[in-house]
């Protein structure tokens, strides 16, 4: 190696090291700025889901319901395994492997964001990152600031809560459209029966709704919902 090539190599290495240091310092600064704004993960262990006021007849038939959100909490142990599988294969197939942030998926989303001139075409959020958003923890403006907050809180939640606790929160809080929040409420909204009584096709239909709960639910967008259901079933087949 000539003296000139050694100098070029040394310069490149110095620039790379300087860039790495700048990135580390920037991330540290972002963390110090945002961390005080992040709630404690323990908060989500005791979260109370908003449920509407329900009026029943003497023989316990529902006759009226008041409230903006329809929520029917369900324990993870009572959720059909096929629905859990459909949801994970569709929304976050590495849920039980990552520590709150799926770096690979996040990197692909960032690349897509750049290639598509700022248009979001692929979601990079894990189920853990989506829980605070579904519970209204952060405002929906300032996309990049919110994303950093979601990442920091997801890492905290994964350290202090179990995977099953996080998944149960998600299943009970994710929006399904038509005022239905949570899988049990969605089952009654679209099929008039509990989650445990649904067929595989119906469970797959519900699992595909969270990506577009308003435009992609079976009532507002039946064709889109069917296409999404078929995609969920294909992914379940591929994952085995």
PLM features per residue range, with description:
Residues 1-56, 94, 114, 239:
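N-terminal type II signal-anchor transmembrane helix
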Residues 7-11, 15, 81-82, 146-150:
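Residue-level signature of transmembrane alpha-helical entry/exit and packing/kink sites
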Residues 34-86:
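Terminal hydrophobic membrane-targeting helix
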Residues 47, 66-67, 99-105, 124, ...:
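Short, glycine-/polar-rich solvent-exposed loops and beta-turns at beta-strand/coil boundaries
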Residues 63-65, 96, 214-217:
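Short small-residue beta-strand/loop micro-motif enriched in glycine and branched aliphatics
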Residues 75-127, 181-186:
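Flexible, acidic/glycine-enriched loop-and-adjacent beta/alpha segments
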Residues 119-240:
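Non-catalytic, structured segments within soluble enzyme domains
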